[in-house]
């Protein structure tokens, strides 16, 4: 596969697959018939049992049931910087030797989990261990963790969502990547290239990098490829496909961007963005919305014809209420309110309400207490603002939002001056943006 070819695997390499799953990458590596050692880890007991049966006669493939993010054996392999975040004192001479040699693995490959729920107790542990990192997202922690496990000069290739490139919550990770690795290549492509995967709000990416903390990493050129139409094109970027675009940036230039964001456009537009004295956050509150914790249970659709409505229940029209109360609809056993979710076919005004969220008082009380639900930025629910779906599109379709709860996949823009609402709505829908 493309990812395996990017690692340039050699005899005697020690390789890690931190979320081995069915062993697809392992099979590809074994087919190269190299004299290598593979550590295959997974948190799922069923997957591990399958892997052990699959590779029972291969002593060079070691399968372990473990949580990669908290595994103590991997802690021993990580370089000194992460150890100091795990504990205050580490005096073991053998571990010092491993640390001084900069990690343990020559190559790391994987498709780490994303969006996995972390309970609050585990979050506390992860916050202590991975200081400064956003611990609610697993894939970024896997990336951060695995770079520490690489030897200097070791290579990593991961397939992960592309949100680490631009979301503010991943600022610290981007800085770490740009200062501690040479990023060779990033491919960005639709998530629906792979069966059963379709984020809607982001693309997938394949990142290939080499661990190197020298000052020279800042002079490294990062190549970013976009415009893929089919999954087959992922392995054919050298064939000069007409639809592919290649952007090349020095890591030092990306470090100059606000929050170290990967702004994927031509350099003249990057300069305009970086030189701007007024940002949208200066004139408006920009927030994401609500998550029920179990959308199939609490979210309904008006019609099965709506995009993304598969497996959702249709709403009972007799249970829809005009309620704008954060505490929920009172004196009803089951009630729903209009919900802003998904993309819009039109700009400025959505044609009709298509989604509904359960909002009776008992259910709202449940959301507030439930560990999986996110009753976030609730002071903006039912307010007047602008809704922009977090979907990849050639054209932004911003719509007016009044008296609605909005989904976490929606960016809500709430101008600090009420007289600016229509100006900003027009601006967001203009060709300038």
Residue ranges and their predicted role:
Residues 12:
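Phosphate-coordination loops involved in phosphoryl transfer and adenosine-cofactor binding
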Residues 147, 272, 276-433:
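Polybasic, glycine- and aromatic-enriched phosphate-binding surface used to engage nucleic acids
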Residues 52, 174, 425-429:
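Generic solvent-exposed, charged/amphipathic alpha-helical segments
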Residues 1-2, 6, 15, 19-36, ...:
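Signature of N6-adenine DNA methyltransferases within the class I
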Residues 9:
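A positively charged, amphipathic N-terminal helix/segment that binds anionic biomolecules
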Residues 63, 186, 339-340:
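Conserved beta-strand scaffold positions in the cores of enzyme catalytic domains, especially
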Residues 55:
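Conserved hydrophobic residues forming the short capping helix/wall of the S-adenosyl-L-methionine
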């Amino acid at each position: 596969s493309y990812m395996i070819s990017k690692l340039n695997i050699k005899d005697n390499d020690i390789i890690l697959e931190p979320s081995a799953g069915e062993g697809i990458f392992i099979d590809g590596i074994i087919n190269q018939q190299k004299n290598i050692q593979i550590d295959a880890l997974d948190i799922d007991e069923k997957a591990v049992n399958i892997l052990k049966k699959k590779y029972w006669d291969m002593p060079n493939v070691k399968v372990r049931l473990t949580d990669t993010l908290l595994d103590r054996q991997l802690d021993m392999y990580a370089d000194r910087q992460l150890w100091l975040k795990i504990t205050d004192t580490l005096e073991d001479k053998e571990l010092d030797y491993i640390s001084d040699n900069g990690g343990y693995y020559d190559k790391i490959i994987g498709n780490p989990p994303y969006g996995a729920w972390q309970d609050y107790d585990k979050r506390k542990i992860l916050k202590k261990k991975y200081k400064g990192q956003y611990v609610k997202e697993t894939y970024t922690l896997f990336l951060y963790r695995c770079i520490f496990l690489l030897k200097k000069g070791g290579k990593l290739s991961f397939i992960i969502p592309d949100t680490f490139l631009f979301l503010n919550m991943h600022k610290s990770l981007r800085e770490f990547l740009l200062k501690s690795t040479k990023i060779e290549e990033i491919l960005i492509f639709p998530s629906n290239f792979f069966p059963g995967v379709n984020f809607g709000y982001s693309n997938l990416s394949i990142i290939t990098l080499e661990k190197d903390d020298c000052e020279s990493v800042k002079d490294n050129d990062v190549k970013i490829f976009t415009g893929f139409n089919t999954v087959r094109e992922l392995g054919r970027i050298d064939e000069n496909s007409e639809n592919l675009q290649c952007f090349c940036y020095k890591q030092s230039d990306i470090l100059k961007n606000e929050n170290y964001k990967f702004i994927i456009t031509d350099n003249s537009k990057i300069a305009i963005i970086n030189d701007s004295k007024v940002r949208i956050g200066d004139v408006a509150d920009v927030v994401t919305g609500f998550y029920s914790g179990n959308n199939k249970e609490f979210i309904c659709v008006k019609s099965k014809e709506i995009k993304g409505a598969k497996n959702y229940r249709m709403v009972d029209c007799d249970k829809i209420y005009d309620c704008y109360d954060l505490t929920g609809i009172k004196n009803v056993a089951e009630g729903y309110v209009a919900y802003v979710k998904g993309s819009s076919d039109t700009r400025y005004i959505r044609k009709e309400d298509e989604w509904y969220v359960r909002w009776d008082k008992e259910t709202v009380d449940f959301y507030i207490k439930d560990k999986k639900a996110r009753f976030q930025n609730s002071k903006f629910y039912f307010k007047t603002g602008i809704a922009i779906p977090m979907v990849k599109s050639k054209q932004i379709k911003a719509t007016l939002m009044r008296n609605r709860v909005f989904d976490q996949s929606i960016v809500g823009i709430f101008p600090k001056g009420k007289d600016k609402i229509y100006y900003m709505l027009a601006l967001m829908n203009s060709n300038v943006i």
